């Protein structure tokens, strides 16, 4: 419910004739302003580039005890009310950070404190670093540190009045009933059956009133009667939602092994060395799939907790399965808080409060878990550090690895990066030895624990299959592999990185591919709902493809609008036709995992099955550990190889290597069958031969020649508008300003032995139109170590703003589409 404010007075009433008066009432004197006892830097919760810097406000005497760094406050700004966040407090105006010799007489006072402190002074400093590093507003960066649901906001209503909106998500208090010491000796009358039932139930411990009422069809009157007698006591306790996630998965145990492998021991020793040195150093754990990286994390966390500090573990959202969470909770119990998108808003708030209160000392979560209010942070772990999902897609477009490295430096704790396919950037920094003031060390873990070995990889050349007359989506080797799985009652995993039934429809007469009316992207066909769906904006259209009699091409009217390519739904249908009925076929993609706990339930179904095939998109490639899986099949490995993105090969290699690692993790040997039309591609060869260098040597040569990361920093400036000309003109203006700036500074770069930053473009984006907005971008290549953000920010300020045109900056960009 919004709380109405009277900040600027009520509207003047219409004049009415004054009633006769005997004498004029004396005018009420204006109250004297409160004395200002301190000053605060306040960042307004208005995310515009022009208002990014803090503003100085006075702290009146009445608010002096409440005002803290991290508090949300209500202030006047111009002719409006605004919420803001205190990021600094000083007794004198001259001592305030960012003060530009302001006149104390002109400083306005803070009107009210809207919330307690929600972040620390160190968090405010990290947010300021992020704001500068990623050319984002400071308020956007501070919001990352706020609790789920946010903080109070000031909004303008339809009537023009300003009001405070409080977060809708609130804590829940449960009422618990328990016996008093006297209650254990109390004997109820023989006729008091319900009292006896209640006392017998409470002998085992406290019970919620809600559960008692359900169990005994309302116990309220009995509880009140015994409470008056002093037999029971009722108290309110905070409910911690999000802690009850249970799983039947057999591999969710975090029980420590009897012994560690040599690789695990080396990794743990290096992490311990970095912890004791306390310089914020980085350890890259480069371990093959199934090498036991999670056990290294668990053992390192045990040592950190024993030292009285806390730990943060980041896992890609796609890998944050019940298996992963179960391992941490089985080892550390209720001290683990979990954050992921499948939690409700209330569950996220309770997990955040568990961390804030100190009840949780270990956080496991996706990218945003990095900003949880852990006290005395002693270790940061980023699992699957190569994952592109660690790069935020909206402003502030930070990379979790870079922010974590900055946090590790400030908190003087180690940062551990783990992956079977480390990113080119992390490997390059380990080769250099130092980066950003920290030491970067790589530790290899080449072996799997026990007797498990890496799977055998076979390549199914689809060119030969086609030449021999096969038109099936499954090659002969893959069919034979699935038959062996069924015969031995084992399990298989099939990867196909396209959801839906068919990637697109195409007219066989004119070649038209239906595209979204609002975006320049082809529509995906979904057989279950008979719809074409846009996976960019979510729009959908009902359609009946050929051979339905109602099938019609939107361009030429032909009825030969046919399904082209493969989707997971189509492969699922083919598997049902090919395999016996007693083989469970389980599909996991964005469509089948929409519901709450759907992801966990599908994995539990796969785990419990006697013989099963798990078919899915990239979400099945990581974070899964099923010893019964002996076969992994890749239906089409070529889809991601030739995308117009210099990281396409790296992403394809990561995906194939990761999914291949799902096979042979138990006592039984594993087999991987990769179907491809490009068997000689370095990505395919590297996976097949278990030799990363086949791909990385080729890939790094290509990047070095073309000047791409890790040899330069790559920034993407994106402009969009419903008016294509306005967007094109605006990005052209930005490009000219950048080129002019660096042309003038070229002698300075050359004297320093550094390359001059380059501007490529502007040009239309690969997806030229999305949600009815035309998109243009330019790329900036700058030397590694050069702080290009300051130059970009200065040019954006000089370019000004254009009504209806939006701009975003992606420093160290991952997505160039």
Q: Regions from the language model: what does each represent?
A:
Residues 693-694, 700-701, 738-739, 744, ...:
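Surface-exposed amphipathic alpha-helical segments in non-transmembrane regions
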Residues 728-760:
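Short amphipathic alpha-helix segments
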Residues 39, 68-69, 583, 606, ...:
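A short, contiguous, amphipathic alpha-helix enriched in charged residues
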Residues 332, 579-581, 741-752, 800-802:
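Short helix-capping segments at alpha-helix termini
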């Amino acid at each position: 419910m919004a709380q109405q404010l009277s900040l600027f007075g009520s509207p003047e009433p219409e004049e009415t004739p004054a009633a006769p008066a005997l004498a004029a009432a004396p005018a009420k004197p204006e109250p004297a302003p409160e004395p200002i006892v301190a000053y605060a830097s306040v960042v307004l919760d208005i995310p515009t580039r022009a208002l990014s810097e803090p503003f100085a406000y006075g702290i009146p005497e009445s608010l002096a005890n409440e005002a803290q760094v991290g508090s949300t406050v209500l202030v006047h700004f111009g002719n409006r009310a605004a919420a803001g966040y205190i990021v600094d407090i000083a007794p004198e105006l001259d001592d305030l950070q960012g003060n530009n010799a302001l006149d104390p007489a002109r400083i306005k006072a803070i009107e009210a404190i809207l919330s307690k402190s929600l972040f620390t002074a160190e968090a405010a400093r990290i947010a300021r670093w992020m704001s500068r590093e990623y050319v984002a507003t400071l308020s956007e960066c501070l919001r990352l540190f706020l609790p789920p649901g946010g903080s109070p906001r000031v909004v303008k209503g339809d009537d023009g009045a300003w009001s405070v909106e409080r977060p809708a998500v609130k804590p829940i208090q449960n009422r618990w009933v328990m016996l008093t010491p006297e209650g254990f000796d109390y004997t109820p009358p023989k006729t008091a059956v319900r009292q006896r039932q209640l006392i017998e139930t409470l002998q085992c411990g406290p019970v919620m009133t809600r559960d008692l009422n359900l169990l005994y069809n309302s116990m309220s009157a009995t509880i009140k009667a015994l409470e008056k007698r002093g037999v029971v006591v009722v108290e309110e306790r905070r409910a911690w939602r999000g802690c009850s996630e249970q799983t039947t998965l057999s591999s969710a145990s975090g029980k420590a092994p009897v012994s560690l492998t040599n690789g695990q021991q080396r990794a743990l020793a290096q992490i311990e060395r970095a912890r004791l040195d306390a310089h914020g150093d980085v350890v890259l754990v480069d371990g093959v799939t199934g090498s036991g990286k999670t056990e290294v994390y668990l053992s390192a966390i045990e040592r950190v907790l024993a030292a009285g500090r806390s730990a943060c573990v980041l896992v890609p959202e796609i890998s944050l399965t019940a298996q992963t969470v179960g391992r941490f909770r089985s080892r550390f119990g209720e001290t683990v808080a979990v954050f992921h998108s499948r939690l409700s808003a209330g569950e996220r708030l309770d997990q955040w409060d568990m961390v804030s209160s100190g009840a949780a000392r270990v956080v496991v979560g996706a990218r945003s878990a990095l900003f949880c209010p852990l006290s005395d942070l002693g270790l940061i772990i980023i699992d699957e550090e190569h994952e592109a999902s660690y790069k935020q897609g909206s402003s502030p477009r930070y990379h979790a690895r870079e922010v974590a490295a900055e946090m590790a430096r400030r908190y003087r704790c180690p940062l551990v990066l783990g992956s079977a396919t480390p990113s080119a950037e992390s490997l390059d920094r380990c080769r250099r030895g130092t980066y950003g003031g920290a030491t970067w060390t790589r530790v290899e873990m080449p072996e799997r624990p026990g007797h498990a070995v890496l799977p055998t990889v076979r390549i199914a050349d689809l060119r030969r299959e086609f030449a021999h007359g096969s038109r099936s989506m499954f090659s002969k080797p893959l069919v034979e592999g699935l038959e062996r799985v069924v015969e031995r009652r084992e399990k298989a995993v099939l990867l196909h990185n396209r959801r839906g039934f068919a990637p697109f429809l195409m007219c066989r007469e004119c070649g038209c591919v239906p595209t979204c009316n609002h975006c320049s992207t082809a529509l995906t066909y979904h057989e279950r709902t008979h719809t074409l769906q846009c996976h960019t904006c979510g729009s959908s259209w009902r359609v009946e493809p050929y051979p339905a009699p109602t099938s019609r091409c939107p361009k030429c009217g032909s009825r030969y609008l046919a399904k082209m390519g493969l989707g997971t739904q189509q492969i699922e249908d083919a598997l049902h036709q090919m395999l016996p009925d007693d083989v469970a076929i389980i599909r996991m993609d964005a469509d089948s995992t929409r519901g709450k706990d759907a992801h966990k339930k599908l994995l539990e179904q796969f785990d419990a099955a006697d013989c099963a095939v798990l078919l899915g998109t990239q979400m099945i490639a990581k974070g899964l550990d099923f010893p019964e899986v002996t076969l992994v099949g890749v239906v089409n490995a070529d889809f991601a190889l030739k995308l117009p993105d210099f990281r396409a090969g790296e992403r394809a290699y990561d995906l194939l290597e990761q999914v291949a690692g799902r096979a042979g993790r138990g006592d039984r040997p594993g087999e991987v069958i990769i179907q491809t039309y490009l068997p000689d591609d370095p990505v395919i060869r590297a996976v097949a031969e278990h030799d990363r260098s086949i791909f990385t040597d080729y890939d790094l040569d290509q990047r070095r020649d073309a000047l791409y990361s890790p040899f330069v920093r790559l920034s993407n400036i994106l402009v969009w508008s419903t008016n294509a000309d306005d967007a094109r003109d605006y990005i052209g203006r930005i490009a000219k300003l950048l080129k002019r700036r660096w042309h003038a500074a070229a002698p300075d770069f050359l004297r320093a032995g550094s390359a001059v930053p380059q501007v490529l473009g502007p040009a239309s984006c690969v997806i030229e139109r999305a949600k009815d907005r035309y998109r243009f971008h330019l790329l900036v290549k700058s030397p590694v170590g050069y702080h290009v953000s300051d130059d970009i920010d200065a040019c954006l300020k000089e370019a000004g703003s254009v009504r209806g045109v939006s701009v975003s900056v992606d420093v160290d960009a991952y997505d160039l589409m």
